[in-house]
Amino acid sequence: MYSNVKYVYGNHDNIKEVLNDLEIEKVDGILLDLGVSSYQLDEKSRGFSYIGNAELDMRMDQDQELTAKKVVNEYSEENLSKIIFEYGEERFARNIAKNICIYRKEKTIETTNQLVEIIEKSIPKAKQNDGHPAKRTFQAIRIEVNNEIKPLMNTVKDSIEVLNKNGRLVIITFHSLEDRAVKEAMIEAEGRCT
């Protein structure tokens, strides 16, 4: 360990608050690892996985209110379709959202198996050859529940603001949505540089 390095566990969209709590104004470098906790994803009872059955939860932070169960049972068909398409890059998003809404009129969607069943019926069998058919929808709902993409623009902006001159910002992304959001924020920040 280095004496001039501080490792901080926290949410990246609170970077200014974290530094303020540490009484640090400026830093020479920031490393942001945007990856999700595989420990949490592997914990079947947390409802992240489309393999096995569990209550629909998907919260990284168990204290937050929004759950996957709330998303699939309370969001409008239009909003569900948008989330599944944008965050899951799922081309059958409209059909999945429509079938979720049809199913929940009869019965509350409470488990991962129920959601998987709906998704599998929403995607033509001939198109179910690119991994598990629920993969993209589960990713989309997880991203929505944990607000994983929206704060990235501000995180990049705030990180740049707290860097010393010639400071370095390193961001590790894990999927194209994060990558795209970070690139857009960097391009916007570059435009502000003189």
Where are each of the predicted segments found?
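S-adenosyl-L-methionine-dependent methyltransferase catalytic core, i.e., the SAM/SAH-binding region
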Residues: 1-194
